[in-house]
């Protein structure tokens, strides 16, 4: 499906993706995500790593290049 441009909003009205953090440092991305979703369990992982397949509505994956720069849209999951 197409990439969101302003972040997706889930059925509960909560934000579920953060396209605005692509290109930022992982630390800055975490700060922004936690502002929108204070209970988020943020996992910073390399873009080519395997991610768990079980869905967790409180988990947000931040996929990074070279362990510092956000590479893809961060999403709940």
Curated annotation (Swiss-Prot):
Record GO terms (molecular function): serine-type endopeptidase inhibitor activity
Gene3D superfamilies, per database record: Trypsin Inhibitor V, subunit A (3.30.10.10)
Annotated coiled-coil segments of the chain: none
PROSITE patterns: POTATO_INHIBITOR
Keywords, in A-Z order: Protease inhibitor, Serine protease inhibitor
PANTHER family (alphabetical): PROTEIN, PUTATIVE, EXPRESSED-RELATED, SUBTILISIN-CHYMOTRYPSIN INHIBITOR-2A
The protein's name: Subtilisin-chymotrypsin inhibitor CI-1C
Protein species of origin: Hordeum vulgare
